[in-house]
Structure formats: C-alpha cells, structure tokens
Amino acid sequence: MGSRPYRRRLAWGAAALLAAGVAVPAAYAASDSGDASGQGAPAALSAGHGAKKAKNVILLIGDGMGDSEITLARDYTVGAAGRLNMDKFPLTGSYTTYSVDKNGKPDYVTDSAASGTGWATGQKTVNGRISKTPGTDKPMTTILELAQRNGLATGSVTTAELTDATPAVLASHATDRSCAGPADMKACPSDTVAKGGPGSIAEQSVNHKVDVLLGGGKARFDQKITEGRFKGGTVTQQAEKLGYQVVTDDKGLKNARPGKPVLGLFADGNVPVEWTGKAAAQGGTEPQRCVTSNPERKAGTPSLDDQTRKALQLLEAKQKGSGKGFFLQVEGASIDKRDHAADPCGQIGETAALDRAVKVARAYAAAHPDTLVITTADHAHTSQIVPLEATPPGLSSTLVTNEGGRLKVNYSTNTPGKAQEHTGTQVRIAAQGPQAERVLGVTDQTQLFTTIRSALTLR
C-alpha cells in the first residue's frame, strides 16, 4: 500500500514527459526503483537512447548564475510573473558543483577552474586547476578535444578573457588558472615549453586550432613568446601563422569568412559589461534604476548574442557537406564578476545578455532539431533577494524594477570591502533536443560531460 502514491506520481511524471515528446524507457515508466543519491531517475531516463543522436551541441554557461541570480534578473527585467528565455526550456534539473582536494575529498565550494574541468572532462579536480588531475597534475582529455577527434567543428565564446577559467578548460591543461599568457607562467613551471610542457593557456588555445574563439584577453595574446617554435612573436602572431583570421570589433567579426579559424579579441581584458549602476553598500542604497549602457564599453564591441549568432554561422558553414556537426560553448562570464563586486546592475545586465544568447541558440535548435541546447551555471553565488524592511549585514542595494516594484538585493558572503564569494549550492541545468532528458533530477556537474559525449556519440 505504501508504494502506490509514489507509483502514481512516477506514472504521472512519465506521462508528462511523453506529452512533451520525450521518449520514456519502460524501466522508468514501470519501476519505482531509485538510489539514495537521487541519481536513479536520470540514469533510467538516459537508458535506451543510444540511437537518439545529436548532430550539434550548444552549451551556454552563466558563470555564477545560481537560482538567485536568475530570479533577480527575471524580477528586474520581465517581472516576477514573467519568464526569461532560459526559463522556457522543456526539461530542467539541478546539479551539484563541488570540487575536490588533492586527496579526492570534497571541497564544498568550487571555483570556475575546477567546476569547468568537471563538465569538460567528466572528472573532479582541485580549485584553480585547468583540466588536470587533482593529485598527479596530469592532463585529462576534454570534451572539445574529443569533438575534434571525431571530426566536429568547435567553438568557444565568452565575455571574459579567452584565457579565463571557463573557456580555458576546453582547449588547455594548466596546473594553475593564472598561467594565462607566456608572461604569466610563474605558477606553472612544468607547463612551460622549455620544460616540455604545452605553454600558456593562450598558446594552447590557438595550438588546438579551435575553429571559433571569441572574447576578451587581447593583452594576453599580445604577450611575447619566449620559448619554442614561435619564440620572439606574440601569441596573436602565432595564431595568424596557424591560419587564424584575427578580428577586434563587430565589423571585423561580420566580415570573417568560413574556411579559416577565427580569433576575436574584443577587449584587452574582460569585455566591459553592458549595464551600470551603484554598487551595493553597507546600510543599503537609495532606490535606483539600472543604466542600460556603459561608457567603458567601446563602440564596435559585439554583443554576446551577435557573437553567438556568428559563431553558429561559421561552424555550420565549416561543416557544410561533411555530414558532421559542431560543439559550441558560450559563456556569460561577468554575472560572476559583478556578483563578486556586489554590483547588482552589472550582474543583471550580463544575465540579460546571456539570456539573449540563449534565445539565439534556441532559435537555431528550432530550425535544426538535431541540436542539443543546454544552459547551466558553473557554480552559485552570493546575491540574495531580501525583504525591503530587512537590515541585513553586508552590502545591500534597492532597485526599482521594470514593473515598478522595489527589490532589495544583499551580498553577505564576505567582509565588506573584500570580494564576495561563491556559494556551494546546487544550480539549475535545463535543456532541449536529443538526450535532453539526461539533465532531469539531481545530477553532478561531471555528468554533463557524459550527456554531451553520449548525445554526440563521441569516441
């Protein structure tokens, strides 16, 4: 008797999935088995889908975009009852994000290097490390490398420096995330070319011949190479010798043509954010509206959605007639960076920018239903929506939303005056397309690697 309500709920869940057009294995529809970790439902749902192949995968990462950050952007931009583009995916789950120490024991709050390594390689590592093992510091094969081996086109788009942790995990292996350019190798002596290593993150990224690399970090690529085949030149010059078209603004990006890889460098450092406003403060701020412009953002800086659209065009054109598809990662990086700075307007604007890129990706998938689109975060972050009458510790700001309401956001994960910190909570993962059902339930970040590998049948 005690199992009947559970079975009714399970059957209803299976029926809902069938109504949404998702094939449900008999094991899931008829069985109430599951494990204590909460992994049972996703494992069952993923069974029997070997023939359900994706030609393309688009992975969109909101750096630091926990549920609180999504809710804040939704409340401000489209209203509490509204829905963002990222809210419209048919299938949604959550995943855990912890990293590990050098002995493999959980470190409950990850950084972006370890979290990115999780989905890029399917393995946990220590904070600060880029796609290398936690104890022995050995390179681990990434999803982008597998995609290349299987003949897929590949791309990485970010609003951070292209050498920042999240893009770096795809096409480089580094002992420490700080080893961005040839002049930044202090923390990675064994990775230097002189020691037989692969060089800096910037050098590795172009050596990997990723078809589309778009983001910031021009200053890293303009550093001089001091060792190896390209000694004496800059990483940008190395890229050009390897056949890259190098572009630095929206006009150059628009004119980039398929047939040669593209390196887009749109800022010396991180690409400046789209929105500005007063940072949160002790005791709060006067109610403010965000300014939807930024004087530090140069004219001619392409938006994240425009970069995503162009990347899709280039990757599709490269594969025309081959029968093979592509893997593209798109990162909204400064959600995290403005969260660290307790800057609600900057944070909301960058979430809105990623949401427009999500719209582009979903539109592409609507026209190409063999495309798996996934959106998620690397980790959760600090911002919390609190009652207007509350006087919380830390830093607060009151915003006047687009629907005319007042909203108070608080940042209290570190002492005022210091950068706010990541949090260790699970984050949303949502998807549509072939094998999207794998994101359902509570999974772990490392399982995203398996989802993509399975959908693309990478070997």
Could you say what each language-model-derived stretch is?
Residues 54-56, 65-70, 75-117, 163-459:
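A post-motif C-terminal structural segment
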Residues 1-17:
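N-terminal export and membrane-targeting signals
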Residues 99-135, 145, 154-159, 163:
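Noncatalytic scaffold domains of N-terminal-nucleophile
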Residues 43-53, 363:
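A short acidic-Thr-Gly-centered motif at the start of a beta-strand
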Residues 53-69, 74, 135-151, 161:
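Active-site-adjacent structural elements in enzyme catalytic domains
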Residues 22-43:
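C-terminal region of N-terminal signal peptides and the immediate post-cleavage residues
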Residues 151-153, 368:
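Secondary-structure transition into beta-strands, especially the periplasmic turns and strand N-termini
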Residues 59-60, 156, 375:
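Structural beta-sheet core signal
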